[in-house]
Structure formats: structure tokens, C-alpha cells
């Protein structure tokens, strides 16, 4: 057998089937774009369903691929077994009604045993077939020459997922030798059994029946072939290593983790699990982010968040307590660059996403673990071995612990999690969100009289701000009326209207309806269930009557402000993509006459430099005076043009395309300027985060931008006055004052250090001796944890050999720091364990290394008790 790299095996497979007349299908994105039934692409055949179900006829009925895939249904096994993965590659060859069993079997054998290809020893291969698949049995025995004793009939060799195509399958197994199993009395020691010796390397599915709704099977008119070979498993056999993780697909990642952690792979089962989890999960996350997924609390994003946080949890077991996964992205990119160059091309972006997610979790991790520790203690005190759904939800909602992560921590403590209770809390949260989203004024969800009105109403407001129209219906309090009088609030439907109804983030127009008989002040416009514009207003004078002819007039000054802000929003959207990356997508917007608000997906903070660049681009496009073209197009044509569509929006067959020169193109039903020069000026007023992975920009245009700049200048002039400086010298004056302040702070710190040394010297006389070891536990004055650690270090230096645990109370919270010298560690004492125990008494948590550790708590009144408990712990060890 040849020695081959994983890249060589992958390419060899594709080359072999290309020689056999197969079209090589590119590896599709992990994020399915045309299959709503899938969260991820999870197999080689998943991307070819369109061919197998007849929706699309392939140019070539013979297809092969190497398809990246994600499965997370048994994530808890990843890292604990030799071959479970969340990300893997499937090599497959497929026939859509072309060749069948004979060719599939012959070619599989040729690829595996020919010296030109893999070159396996044929005597080490066995096969399994379905008991009733005589055709496959005969082909293996007579055509290929496999001895009967190595052809095993198994009932399980039938591929069936319910209604639809199904059929028998045959699997090929490689004998890895007696070192992986030699007990002849083991009932599972055979190809197809649960053992490590006979490893399945290829599965050939013969799709020849249709599974009918009544449970019967009938032959398919066109028979198909669907095969799958796991690259990771195949490479483990070729490279003669015990697990998939020992192949060249994983080992460079594991070596990098060794460097980061200072630990070694292959020493203990617990450590190896951590190495494997990290190596597997970074591959999954890197590829998923490369294909457009981002961490979040829903769907695919939740999977990524769960994987990253699971990796962080295992990293702690090999002493990695900082964000580090992002450092592994270049390693993954280098391993996979030959076939998947996209990962290397997006390496910086992927690392940025992962680093941001890691940093967010680390901010809450220790506090969350402290809460979990309290919860576990509370339940044990009650005699319970289950964590309540309410507590699990709190850890999820407040500290970012995926429920599965809490389950793993609970399992370590021999406890369970109330899943049903957690789901109930989640449903309560969803209900709260639904209630918050409900717009009581929304016409779209109302039935009654409005729902029964079918008469047509035409919107002419794209071209005209006035129109002569008939009042076709009047409503008050949800009921149809024939007239409304002065002072009444009324809803009016017109046969023709220039008023824009609130939608797509753009607010409704305001204005008037006038005639000789009546004047109505229009305050709001919404869409009725059947699409008509419903004008809500107050009768200022006269009487409104059904059938009356009125002049409908939009307040032009308000509309002008709205269109400036709406077109500016489109420019902003594209500028965000240009500066931050193509992952940016609109997550919400509000456009009114005074300002615009734009919510967008982004994984980290936007820097001042990036904001400045975004603002500059938008203004440059405004000053270029670009024409804005608006056309109606078939949706397919619009998408081919590259028009941005909003995720979750429903579009008809014909869509409205708004194009700003060759810079921006979006599907949009709103109102816009004719030329960007009309906007005048664009100024970002604020940028902030509004949720995980979502940012918000508020901006102003035209006169509003001028006023914003004037306000900022006024603030600058006021600051200059307070600083007794001119405006140009304000930065220098601030820098000078900061330098003076730092000097004062340095003097204060020097005084504090001297005081600490003095206090440390004074408490040396309180050292006790337990079992021949110096022990010092004391409550001290320390302004923060850094100050406390410095005191511990000073005392360690003075004592030379000792156990030191100091506690301090600051702003109602407890800080605890511990230090243990090396010689005492060898006697069995561990700073991390001592500090954890003390912190738990104070209602907190923490830990650390054997020589140095720190923790926090919430109950300062229990600090003395906690410090006393440390002495008891030392006695129990010594």
C-alpha cells in the first residue's frame, strides 16, 4: 500500500472517476441555498438531490465529488471516539439512471486494489451485502473473485429513509490486523460488527426500489448509484494510524494546540479528548464561517456558538484560559488549501469572527461557572441531582452557556439537567418577544371590515405627490361608516393615492385630503390586509363622506427628507459591505424625514477608522451626483444582476430594482431621490451594538447633517473654553492633562506599594505552622485583585516556603488570592483548589494553577469563615 497524503487521496479519487467519464461536481457551500429542509449540507448526495428527484437533468448522468459536510446530531461523542466528527468530507461517485451494480462494484475494487491507485492488498478486504441481493453477491464472488468467506450477508445492508427511493447496499471493509482485535470468541469481531479491526472504507448504495406510502416496494424505472467514502476514515487506513485524529488532516492542529497549552497529546485519555474536540470543532467553525454562517443564538449560528463554547470548555482541561481558537485558523487553512482555497483567502475574516466570539464568552465564563457552582451546591443541599430548567435558562440567557454545555458540566458533577423546564423557559421568552413585536396598529393582522374590503386602490406616489381621488370607504373604530364629522378620527380608502404606506422601514407620508366640503389632516398610512393604503387622519373641518372627490396632497418637505435618507441607506449598506466585508446584511431599518437607522449583521465592534471610511465613501457617492434608476424586473433577472434581497422578505415574480449607478443595486419598494447629489451631505451620528452579532448605525443627511456638525462644533468650542485653549489645541491640552494625571496616579501607586509592603511585614507575625508548613491566611486591605496578588507575591518571596491565602473586600465584593511555593505543592497542596473552596463559602467561584490562583465572591460577611476553612483544608492534606 502506498504512503499518501489526504490531499493526494482526495485528488486521486476524483481523477479516477473522471477517467471513468464522470463530471466532477465542485464541493458546494455548507449552507444550503435551495433546500429549506437542511440546516447544513450533511452528505455528498445532499447537493445532488435536484438530480435524483428529477427537478434538474444533469448534463452528465455520471457525477463524482468531494463534498464538505457538517453533522452535529451526536456531538457529545466527538473527541471521545476514534471517528466521530462534526465536519468531514465525503468522496462519492453517482449514477443518475446510467450505470448500476456491476460498474459500481468493479470500479470500487479497481480504485482500492490497483497499484495505479490506492493499492490495498485484496486479501485484506471483505464485503457485506443484503441477504436478498443475490446480484451483488454473485458480482463480488464471480466477477471480482472475493472468496465466499469474506462476503458477509447482513440484514442491515438496506438503505431506506421512508417513502421514496431505496435499495440494498454493499460495504467494503479493510482488515487492520490483529493488533486491533484478535479474540476469536468476540461475537462482534467480523466485517460489519462493532470492532476496531475491520474498518468500513466505502458504502455503495443501489437505489433500485421506490418505497410506496402503503409500505410496499416497486422497482424504479431508472436505477441510481449513490456511494460514499469518508475521507478521514480512508486516510487513517492508508496512513496506518489508530484514529482519524492521528492523520495529517488533524495532527498539525493538535501540534499547534500542544504549543499553546504546553500539554502533550497521547498522555492521558482526558487530555486527548480535549485535543480532539478542539481539532474537530475548529475545522467545522472555520469552514462554516467561510461559507457565510456567523455565531448567533438561532439555527446555524447557534451550532457554531455551541461548538466554540464546547471547545473553550475542554481547553480549560489542558490549561488554556484565554481566547486561542482563532490562532488555529491559519493551520486549518494550510492543511486544506489545495482543494479549499476559500478558507485561506478568508483566513483573516474567519479568525476575527472566532476571536470576537471567544472574547465575548470569556467575559462571562468565570462568572457563569461560579453561578453554576452555586446552583449545584443548592440542589445537592436539597438532596436533588437535577439542575432546574429555570437555572439552565439563566445560564443560557445571561452567561451564554448553551444548554448542551451546561449538561456536560452537570455530567462531570454526576447531575442531570431539566430539559423540559429549560424548553418551557425558552417558550416564555419567545412569547415575550412575540408580544413585544406585535404592532397594535398593524393592518396586516386585522380582519373585520378591513379584511372584507376588496375594492382596488392604486398608489401613484412614486411619480406624484398630489392626486385627485374618490373616497371609496370610510371607517371608524373598525366599522364602515358613511360619513365622519369635524374632530373625528377616521380611516379612509382612496381609489388613487400619492401617500406611501409604512413598509420596508420607510415611514408613512403625512399630508392632507381637501375639497370644498372637507379638510382632513392625514397622520399615518398603513396597508390593509388586501393591500390597499389606509389613511388615518382627523377631520379638521367639514364632513367626510363616502364617494366624495378630494385632492390628496403629500407634505413635500417631509417626503424630501425621507427619500434622501432612504437612498443614503442603500449607499450605507453597500459601503458597509465594502469596508467590513460581504458578510454584512441588513437586519432592520427605519427611514424617516429626520434621520435613518440601519441595523446590520457584524461580529465585532466597528472601529473609528472603519466608520470614517464608511462615511467618506457614502459622501463621495453623493458628491459624484450618480443617477438613481428604478425598474421592474422578473425576480430571476434581478438576482442575476446581483440585486441585494433582504433575508426573510417575500417577493413576487416581478420586483422593483433600485440601482445607484454601478455602485448599489437592491430590491426595494420605497421612495428615492433621482440623483445622489440631492442628498447633499451624510453624517454618522452614532454606532452601537444592539445584540449578539448585530450593530446599529444612526445617521443624518442634508440639513440634518449640517445641524449635527454644528452641534459637534459647539461642543468642541465649549470644551476649548473649559480647557482654556483654542479649538485646534484641544487634543494637545487633553494629552497634557492626562500626562499630569498619570504622574499623580504613579505617585499614588508608589505609596500604595509601600503601604502594602508595610502591611505585608506586619502580618508576617501571624504566620502559623501546620505539619511543618508555614501557613498564612488573612483579611487585608487591597484596592483590587492586582494589588492583592502583589501582596501574595511579596509574602511568598519573604517566606520562601509557605501557603498564603489573602482576602479583601472592595465595594461589597470579595477578592481572594492564593500562592503556594513549589516545595509545598509537592506535598499535595494546590492553590487553585484552596481558593475555589474559599470562594464557594463566599458565594462565588474561581480557581487557577497549583502555585497561583484567584477567585471572587458576593458575601463579604463570610470571608473570615472562608479563610479559616483554608487552614482546615491544609491540615487535612498534611
From Swiss-Prot:
HAMAP family: Ala_tRNA_synth_B. It comes from the Bacteria. Catalyzes the attachment of alanine to tRNA(Ala) in a two-step reaction: alanine is first activated by ATP to form Ala-AMP and then transferred to the acceptor end of tRNA(Ala). Also edits incorrectly charged Ser-tRNA(Ala) and Gly-tRNA(Ala) via its editing domain. Binds 1 zinc ion per subunit. It is an enzyme of class 6 (ligase). Zn(2+) binds at residues 566, 570, 668, 672. One of its GO terms (biological process) is alanyl-tRNA aminoacylation. It is found in: Cytoplasm. This is Alanine--tRNA ligase. Consists of three domains; the N-terminal catalytic domain, the editing domain and the C-terminal C-Ala domain. The editing domain removes incorrectly charged amino acids, while the C-Ala domain, along with tRNA(Ala), serves as a bridge to cooperatively bring together the editing and aminoacylation centers thus stimulating deacylation of misacylated tRNAs. GO terms for molecular function: alanine-tRNA ligase activity; aminoacyl-tRNA deacylase activity; ATP binding; catalytic activity, acting on a protein; transferase activity; tRNA binding; zinc ion binding. GO terms for cellular component: cytosol. Gene3D superfamilies: 2.40.30.130, 3.10.310.40, 3.30.54.20, 6.10.250.550, Bira Bifunctional Protein, Domain 2, Threonyl-trna Synthetase, Chain A, domain 2. Its EC number is 6.1.1.7. Keywords: Aminoacyl-tRNA synthetase, ATP-binding, Cytoplasm, Ligase, Metal-binding, Nucleotide-binding, Protein biosynthesis, RNA-binding, tRNA-binding, Zinc.
